[in-house]
Amino acid sequence: VAFLSLTRILKVHYSVDIKLRDSEIKPVDFKFKDYKTWFVDSGLATIMDSKLDLSGIELELKTGFLKVLESREKLKLAKKNRKITRALLVSEAANYDFGIGEAGDLFEALIIYTRVLSGYYDSVYNFNLSTVELNRIKSKGTANP
């Protein structure tokens, strides 16, 4: 009877606590939770105090900030989903290695994990894109990004 052992083929020991290697795709650092804090920290408050008129882009700034917060929440959800499906894949691989799992279940878990991982990378991309867009809107009102 043919027996496929992923641990022997890939030369990697699987466990539920396995750490994935960091990829080059990472979300940017955006620590702000509320608009006022971001507005002051980004230097826009001092510009508002000066004679420059930011009233034309203030709505764009608020909308852009809300998009960043929304995409960050989607990113958090995608990160949780990735962790859950990784655990499913590891358990299916272990079951298959022990001879109690079926090949179909293992490949189905692999397909699910691949789709969820792709969704995670999409979420990272959308989050990074929304922060860049917010920075672009901010730079319209100021001379510096």
Indicate where each model-derived feature is located:
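Short, solvent-exposed, mixed-charge loop/turn linkers that connect secondary-structure elements
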Residues: V1-A45, T131-P145
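Amphipathic alpha-helical coiled-coil segments
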Residues: A2, T46-G119, N126-I137
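Juxtamembrane helix-loop transition sites at the ends of transmembrane segments
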Residues: K19, F32, Y120-N126
